[in-house]
């Protein structure tokens, strides 16, 4: 486990991002996922920041339809006397995550953001030379930046074994807060924010797989499933449907593990 180094807990099984799907105003979602691929779910706000993370994983078999209703409602109330909005329409296509999230690699996911917005000032001969972003040092600098650092946040959540609503990594990370408030005129576009938030909310992984061979297998899986993930089609071999009723009506990020 954790060799080569995967993440901050030294107990990471590896993960990658399947993508995002929309959520209806009543909190329901309807989408298709690849069969036999273990996954879990994050609820996202309108900025793409995780507000809570599912702390268990699941998977489905070819042709299976799964409904996640029962665990997210108060015990003393009856289910709504109306069908969820999401089941009244076709399954949503999954929008793939940013480059570098499948397979998941820090250098490919966050590296382009650093190159475009950070290294000009954060290099040995520049004004902000106290933090030098080189390929060898960038990861450790970012996971240890501020208090509580991303490393501290991840390890605390790992020990607690649960995800606290409203206290996600990208919500509370000092670097993310600094950039949102403004930092020497740095202006991140939507892709850059998506890359940073995805990396933080997947708990600061250095990488999501154990070998180059596994990376290649993940790329092949992504290419094979691209049509199913990106297009609204009827259920077919190798795919299944999920209907979910999350607590909060945000987007839902599908994370493959």
Annotate the PLM regions.
Residues 1-10:
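Extended low-complexity, serine/threonine- and proline-enriched intrinsically disordered segments
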Residues 26-32:
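Short, surface-exposed beta-strand/beta-hairpin micro-motifs centered on an aromatic residue
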